[in-house]
Amino acid sequence: MTTHESGQDDPSSEDTVIVAETRTGTYTQQITAGRHQLIADEPAPTGDDAGPNPYDLLLAALGACTSMTIRMYADRKEWPLKRVRVTLRHSRIHARDCAECETTVGFIDHIDRSIELTGDLDHAQRDRLLLIAERCPVHQTLTSEVRVTTSLV
């Protein structure tokens, strides 16, 4: 999320993320999200590998949101979910190699998400939690029409 109107780039604002070069490395970036600080970078040899790369952060957002959404639902239902673990991988594949894709030209971004649920859950509960994972807000954003507006300030 970014804002473009003056006065709305307050780093303490919960709905604003600011990314700025650190100039301590080739591509190292300081990320400020509310009161939280993160570092992003490109892996060596392109960058200095000082932090996760942008796709790692994208996958982390989806994985965290998925796990949190499942946890909230299971807790609300008082189901015996002990642990959620989400493993994600990003790849770019040829569109022609994607059987379920509408696009047949160029490349498709593909995210493989595996969810491990630990606890004494029955099959119906596990199936329901798999459906709930699809309702994670980050998943909804990634699978909806997204528009990014960019401006120079």
What are these language model-derived features?
Residues 1-60, 71-153:
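Extended beta-strand/beta-hairpin segments
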